[in-house]
């Protein structure tokens, strides 16, 4: 099966291709869209079809591409690549930092000819507005709502099967609304596809990614991953004093599973601790900063004072929070069942 990467980081992509080769050896048709300079430095561990961005877009578009933010640039490139005919009708859409953590089979992405979408959020609830990623999610939400589509976020930081025809249809639909390219290719394709080509897509499934967000509790989960099948790779997590300190970033075939499990275990334990406002002394994180600093000690004292308050709130509000969570889940299941039933009606 074809897997298509965007990248401008040859070292990161080289390592990611090693992880993909080990855990997804069947994804052996590798296409990389990147600046020519990146392709020249790639030294890939697998056979790669490299497509220089400069050749895909032509000289007239280079200056415009350079002026775009990260999300707009990626959407522009993926749509242009789909139009070029360089990708298959159904391909795995990936980035250079999406790394498998365990053996993954093709059925993980396609079931009975239908693409499987892994959703991470309801965009009606996504209120962050700090990066081009956030703004692309908001624009996608507004466009999908206008077009009468669902509005789940499939920007789950893992590879997913993308239907080339549906991607181009969705891009055309938003292109009739605006000249902006600040959209999310995964989110548009899956929501638009489920509305207009439901026979090509399965029911949404929960995303299965570790390190999205980078640290647990950077924002509330809309749905928790039931397992960790992929890692959203952050190089700084492997620095001394950080969460994955001591674990190599490059894959060691003899220790791949052991290293993957060690990362999962550290991530899960940090999730449990941070949820109780307890942050390890020796691990850098967004709340305390680097370990051993004066600012970190002051922040630690602050969170220590908050822990009794949090425990009291949890006790007093336990029943209400449980009921709300159960109600929200039931409503979401009923709405999705109703929508699918309506689609199946003649």
Tell where the protein language model's regions lie, with residue ranges.
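Short beta-strand-to-loop acidic/aromatic patch adjacent to the donor-nucleotide binding site
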Residues: 88-99
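PAPS-dependent sulfotransferase catalytic core
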Residues: 190-283, 288-289
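Catalytic core and acceptor-binding pocket of nucleotide-sugar-dependent glycosyltransferases
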Residues: 135-230
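Conserved donor-nucleotide/metal-binding helix-loop-beta segment in metal-dependent transferases, i.e.
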Residues: 102-131
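Active-site-proximal specificity loops/subdomain of glycosyltransferases
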Residues: 35-86
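Boundary detector for helix-to-coil junctions that initiate low-complexity/charged tails
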Residues: 97, 283-346
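N-proximal low-complexity "stem/linker" segments adjacent to membrane-targeting elements
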Residues: 1-11
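Short, well-formed alpha-helical segments that are part of the catalytic scaffolds
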Residues: 10-23
């Amino acid at each position: 099966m074809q897997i298509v990467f965007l990248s401008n980081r040859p070292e990161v992509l080289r390592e990611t291709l090693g992880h993909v080769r080990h855990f997804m050896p069947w994804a052996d048709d590798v296409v990389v869209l990147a600046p020519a300079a990146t392709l020249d430095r790639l030294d890939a561990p697998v056979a790669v079809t490299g497509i220089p961005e400069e050749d895909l877009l032509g000289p007239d578009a280079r200056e415009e591409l350079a002026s775009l933010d990260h999300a707009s640039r990626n959407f522009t490139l993926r749509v242009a690549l789909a139009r070029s005919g360089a990708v298959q009708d159904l391909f795995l859409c990936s980035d250079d930092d999406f790394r498998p953590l365990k053996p993954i089979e093709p059925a993980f992405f396609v079931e009975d000819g239908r693409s499987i979408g892994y959703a991470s959020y309801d965009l009606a609830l996504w209120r962050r507005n700090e990066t081009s990623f956030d703004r692309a999610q908001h624009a996608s939400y507004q466009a999908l709502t206008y077009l009468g589509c669902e509005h789940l976020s499939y920007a789950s930081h893992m590879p997913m099967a993308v239907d080339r025809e549906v991607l181009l249809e969705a891009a055309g639909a938003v292109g009739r609304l605006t000249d902006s390219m600040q959209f999310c290719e995964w989110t548009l394709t899956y929501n638009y596809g489920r509305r207009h080509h439901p026979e090509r897509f399965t029911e949404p499934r929960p995303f299965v990614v570790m390190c999205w967000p980078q640290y647990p509790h950077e924002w509330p989960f809309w749905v928790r991953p039931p397992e960790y099948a992929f890692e959203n790779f952050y190089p700084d997590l492997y620095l001394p004093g950080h969460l994955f300190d001591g674990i190599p970033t490059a894959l060691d075939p003899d220790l791949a599973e052991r290293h993957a499990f060690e990362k999962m275990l550290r991530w899960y334990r940090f999730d449990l601790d941070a949820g109780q406002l307890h942050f390890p002394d020796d691990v850098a994180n967004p709340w305390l900063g680097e370990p051993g600093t004066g600012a970190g000690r002051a922040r630690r004292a602050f969170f220590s004072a908050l822990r009794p308050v949090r425990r009291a709130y949890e006790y007093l509000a336990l029943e209400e929070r449980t009921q709300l969570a159960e109600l929200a889940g039931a409503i979401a299941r009923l709405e999705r069942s109703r929508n699918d039933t309506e689609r199946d009606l003649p």
